Amino acid sequence: MTRTANEFLTPQAIKVEAVSGTSAKVILEPLERGFGHTLGNALRRILLSSLPGAAVVEVEIEGVEHEYSTLEGLQQDIVELLLNLKGLSIKLFDQNEAYLTLEKQGPGDITAADLRLPHNVEVVNPEHLIGTLSATGSLKMRLKVSQGRGYETSDSRFPEGETRPVGRLQLDASYSPIKRVSYTVENARVEQRTDLDKLVIDLETNGTVDPEEAIRKAATILQQQIAIFVDLQKDQTPVAQEPREEVDPILLRPVDDLELTVRSANCLKAENIYYIGDLVQRTEVELLKTPNLGKKSLTEIKDVLASKGLQLGMRLENWPPASLRMDDRFAYRSR
């Protein structure tokens, strides 16, 4: 008998086992036989190639004109210094590019903590080694950081025939926030059926994105790309469509998912802040006006948001989205 799409088993929940702050195992079961490899391979490729991230793309170093130069007092050569800069894990908030500066006098190590950052830039690995200076050495440089996806060569940023500016060292950029991802398919059982799959995805990020959020974004990309196949039998005449509201899925989650202390959570609900999207639009000043919410609670809220790549005072143009109707808010309030 032919089985329809609705008769296939589908996973009821996703299980995330944290290995460390940047590593996790994501388990999905039960799946029909063969779907473990189908979904695992697709998600793995998207995780490695299609998630947005930030990377250093251009460097200006005082006294250096090209990457084959040397700098007196710097233990590393310029090529090694540039390779170390590629190891920076950077997050950009509400912008596509930013400039970072560094001025360091020896002796001692140069780390990411020595960088001077704009308010909307965060380096999540401040201990990362950039270089080492002798007692007579000094380093002054300016970094350009850009947002992108996948891998971009420095040549692709310049039209053919265009001369590169002297003194601005160009870097190939690996924007992906995923350092490593692999998957395995194991046997699963539901009642009397033993011919099912269990998909286990093992991934490690660079710290700029939570592993669970990375899986969610990859699945969203996959869903958007294959959605058109669902409507193959319908009229294919193109029609003008209104732009869809694009909202990060994490903003639609209730504030309870942040696992704040009871005091902080109750203070937010008293101010009708039920979703993370409601919370991130509030400023520190506004929250401090909330009864019983002090600086300790504010610090807790800021730290939890920062761990998910969010911050207070964000501007959300499409909030609340149409999918979050008023009756949904009332239903949540009545819990």
UniProtKB/Swiss-Prot annotation:
What positions belong to coiled-coil segments? none
Q: Which GO terms describe its molecular function?
A: DNA binding; DNA-directed RNA polymerase activity; protein dimerization activity
The region called Alpha N-terminal domain (alpha-NTD) is annotated at: 26-233
Q: Report keywords, A-Z.
A: DNA-directed RNA polymerase, Nucleotidyltransferase, Transcription, Transferase
Its BP terms in the Gene Ontology are: DNA-templated transcription
GO cellular-component term (any)? DNA-directed RNA polymerase complex
Q: What is its EC number?
A: 2.7.7.6
User: Which reaction equations make up its catalytic activity?
Assistant: RNA(n) + a ribonucleoside 5'-triphosphate = RNA(n+1) + diphosphate
Residue ranges, annotated region (Alpha C-terminal domain (alpha-CTD)): 247-335
Q: What is its EC class?
A: transferase
Residue span of the signal peptide, if any?
none
> Is Transferase there in the keyword field?
yes
A Pfam family assignment: RNA_pol_A_bac
The task this protein performs is described as: DNA-dependent RNA polymerase catalyzes the transcription of DNA into RNA using the four ribonucleoside triphosphates as substrates.
Q: How does it assemble?
A: Homodimer. The RNAP catalytic core consists of 2 alpha, 1 beta, 1 beta' and 1 omega subunit. When a sigma factor is associated with the core the holoenzyme is formed, which can initiate transcription.
- Written domain comment of the UniProt record: The N-terminal domain is essential for RNAP assembly and basal transcription, whereas the C-terminal domain is involved in interaction with transcriptional regulators and with upstream promoter elements.
- Family label: Belongs to the RNA polymerase alpha chain family.
NCBIfam families associated with the record = PRK05182.1-2, PRK05182.2-5, rpoA
Q: What is this protein called?
A: DNA-directed RNA polymerase subunit alpha
Q: Which organism is it from?
A: Acinetobacter baumannii (strain ATCC 17978 / DSM 105126 / CIP 53.77 / LMG 1025 / NCDC KC755 / 5377)
List the gene name: rpoA
